[in-house]
Regions:
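N-terminal secretory signal peptides and thylakoid transit peptides that target proteins
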Residues: 1-18
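Short beta-strand edge/turn micro-motifs at domain boundaries
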Residues: 145-147, 151-173
């Protein structure tokens, strides 16, 4: 079992940094052109899945594969654990990353299913202090278009996205708050969280 010291203050620090203080592997520069191509590929696959007419279960499986190919899941998983990462063993971190990949792909896959009948259109790029932001617009039936931003970096020898901001909601910050709340609800037992997270 892992103790949970000062979780509220830790979350506050994460919010203050705006999600920029990621942990994990070193980061190399990624060009705007490479980041744009990466997100264009991601968006093309997402659009193909939402237009496929498959069942929800089939779509969620497809979205898990998309996250595998396009997201820096280890970096995201390490960030959302916050200081709990320091107390976890290597085996726990590996197991959590695997469980979190399924959880986040299903969660955002369900969000992307809301785009059925519409599409995501890439509109531009800009360089950030860390990585590149690729901006897109989600054009859906029956509602006003809204912005979706992808933050892309090269931390594993190729471009990968490490954050998504949908209608102003920052994935890294909201996921850290949610994962730490889930861990609290399980008495700080990381192994229990790992076992239950894919079904959450």
């Amino acid at each position: 079992m892992i103790t949970l010291p000062n979780r509220r203050s830790v979350l506050g620090q994460g919010l203050a940094f705006g999600g920029a203080a990621l942990i994990g592997t070193p980061v190399w520069a990624v060009s705007e052109a490479d980041a744009l191509r990466h997100v264009q590929g991601l968006v093309a696959e997402v659009n193909a899945v939402i237009a496929s007419g498959q069942s929800e279960a089939q779509m969620l499986l497809q979205f898990e594969g998309i996250f595998d190919r396009y997201a820096d899941v280890p970096t995201i998983a390490g960030y959302v654990l916050g200081v709990e990462r320091r107390s976890a063993s290597s085996a726990q971190l590996t197991a959590f990353t695997r469980a979190y990949k399924t959880y986040i792909a299903r969660k955002y896959g369900r969000r992307f299913r809301e785009f059925i009948g519409g599409e995501v259109q890439v509109t531009g790029t800009r360089t950030l202090p860390r990585g590149v932001e690729v901006t897109a617009i989600a054009v859906l039936r029956g509602r006003a278009p809204f912005q979706v931003d992808f933050h892309v970096e090269d931390s594993r020898g190729r471009p990968l996205f490490f954050n998504i901001i949908i209608e102003g909601i920052n994935m890294l910050l909201s996921e850290r708050a949610e994962i730490l709340a889930l861990l609290d609800s399980k008495g700080g037992d990381l192994n229990r969280l790992i076992a239950e997270l894919p079904q959450t």
